Design a protein with these regions (language model features):
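A generic secondary-structure signal
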Residues: 41, 45, 49, 77-81, ...
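Domain-start "cap" segments at the beginnings of catalytic or binding domains
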Residues: 8-29, 269-305
Length: 370
């Protein structure tokens, strides 16, 4: 993060990813609603508290590639709450792709309606160079390649490019993108500052989660990009002062709900660079903000010492009662509050040890319901 105490903020961007709207986790409608309400709260915070001039969303706006009408309607309602002068710049993630080949995706649909700007790279025309079409508000088409944002006090634009999910082909696509950005800037003029939206994991950044892209494959991209806005990995990570991955707004499994997983969004304040003594450069200050999400809490119970179902049930109830104060304390953290009250947690119930009676008498559903 670059800290610039005396610089003047010219533009504020916010960066969120992996909203997964429509995800009915565990088959629960409440979790589907959580995805929407957490994203809504983040958008509202970006606008009212961060004063964002544009929202960056690199992939997985949706959870399901084939949307139910209700989910599409909810997404449109949330996008309509965002002021018209705050563009929502979106690239495609793996969950946003169609299950079957079609010419038009739901991102194309929202782009054509003016609710988002869908950015993607044309990678098929030239195997060495990506092609990027400028966004035209009068003729938006089905997508655009880049979007220019005017910043106060700067003659050149802030330019945002998009690269769609490419999976194992991401490394090759990034080489095409690096060349394509150079050619685009020669054709349309050099920008003051450059953002690339992309959806992939980086090797070794988050151990055990894997990644399809190496730092070596990003070397050419770094020469032409100032801020790589990533999505795909649901855990926050940053690298090299130019790579940022905010973590999904909501945790999508018990592992993601652990305390060592940060979830949220970034605000990026662009400034004139005067605090560094270089008035001709663009400086930037990046802050991470936790999203207001539903907490997870793990309860572990060792069954080994109980010789009958009734003894186990009594001990289990006492154990859960003993955990109540800790649960309340955990859920009272600021990121788990809704309207001033703690949100009810998702309980991750783990039974451990060796059962001393018939497994058929071990009624886990009844214990979980209690």
């Amino acid at each position: 993060m670059t800290t610039l105490q005396e610089s003047i903020t010219m533009l504020t961007l916010t960066h969120i990813a992996d909203t997964h709207l429509g995800h009915r986790q565990y088959g629960l409608k409440q979790r589907e609603d959580d995805m929407v309400s957490t994203t809504r709260a983040a958008f509202q915070e970006m606008i009212e508290e961060r004063g964002t001039d544009a929202i960056l969303l690199p992939g997985d706006l949706f959870h399901s590639r084939d949307l139910r009408p209700k989910i599409l309607h909810q997404i449109e309602q949330e996008l309509e709450r965002i002021p018209d002068d705050v563009p929502v710049l979106v690239s495609r993630g793996n969950h946003d792709e169609n299950l079957t080949p079609r010419d038009v995706t739901w991102l194309n649909y929202l782009h054509q309606r003016g609710q988002i700007v869908f950015l993607e790279s044309e990678l098929k025309a030239n195997e060495d160079t990506a092609w990027f079409n400028p966004y035209d508000p009068d003729e938006p088409g089905q997508s655009a390649g880049f979007y220019d944002i005017d910043a106060e006090g700067v003659e050149k634009p802030i330019r945002v490019f998009g690269l769609q999910w490419r999976g194992a082909k991401s490394g090759l696509a990034l080489q095409q993108v690096a060349e394509g950005i150079k050619e685009t800037n020669e054709m349309h003029g050099e920008p003051a500052w450059t953002v690339l939206l992309a959806h992939f994991g980086i090797e070794d950044e988050v151990p055990t989660l894997g990644g399809t892209v190496t730092h070596g494959e990003l070397r050419d991209v770094k020469d032409v990009v100032d801020y790589l806005a990533l999505g795909h990995i649901h855990k926050r990570y940053e690298s090299g002062g130019w790579i940022y991955n905010p973590g999904s707004p909501e945790a999508h499994n018990t592992r993601e709900g652990r305390a060592d997983w940060d979830h949220g969004y970034y605000s990026i304040a662009l400034n004139d660079g005067s605090a560094e003594g270089n008035s001709s450069s663009i400086g930037f200050d990046v802050d991470h903000h936790p999203t207001k999400r539903r907490p997870y809490y793990q309860i572990a119970f060792d069954v080994t010492e109980y010789e009958s179902p009734s003894n186990l049930e009594t001990a289990f109830r006492e154990h859960v009662q003993d955990e109540q104060a800790a649960i309340t304390d955990h859920c009272s953290q600021s990121e788990f509050m809704a309207g001033g009250d703690p949100r009810a947690p998702i309980i991750d119930l783990r039974f451990t040890g060796t059962l001393q009676f018939s497994r058929g008498d071990f009624r886990t559903d009844e214990l979980a319901a209690w």
